[in-house]
């Protein structure tokens, strides 16, 4: 671990608990001063063993968390799924928060007898081409018993299948990240703030990160990994055969805003993603695709006034775990 990793982990654990330094000093039974705590978080000083133990108890986490040995978070994958948009310090802070949150969630799941093991039903599925992407999306829907219609909540679906999803405030250009803990536990980090994203964007981001977690990406492809993940997200949310049926055929002279708004409100798929899918399937001409992007989508990237997916796209697993623990205590 880097030399300042303890400082980052202490700071992020305190922030995750929404504690001021004064409050943490109080919870630690005043065995540490606010001045010392500040020095720990700045990396100027390290606590003695007895103080470390007390801080761990106050923050409800193992001492191994501070050493970075409580679990192995796949940092290279976290770095990859950030798209190179994050500074290393930001990545370390996110990794610390993710490690802290995951350790506490797993402990609560054990206490509530509410744990689920994740199984990748399309493990080692090689995705090189658009055809591979479509097959992978269709197969996953089949194996997860999703049918060929709208998926009401992809976040709740992913949680049910064993993917742990942490909500976090991410930097401006980053909407989601994904990685593995101990090579067996899939993790997603999503920025769910309404000020930053919309329900359809959030669904697309989550499906994109799902592709990173489940699929294998051979280097011998004309498509970048990011493009393959984008296309998987689109076809997972709106399957090829269903899209063609909804559009009334395999070829269209033009797409209308009104029909795509209707489909957006039903399937939770943005206008932009629908136009992309129509082009991927050669349903529309390049000229019509360019017209939609240049004259419409680029001028309204948040798609304001173009319909809203009404179903609440939220996470809920941790809330239910907490409820079961509270019920046990009664």
Per-region residue spans from a language model:
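Active-site hotspot residues in diverse enzymes, especially metal/ion-binding acidic/histidine motifs
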Residues: 1-330
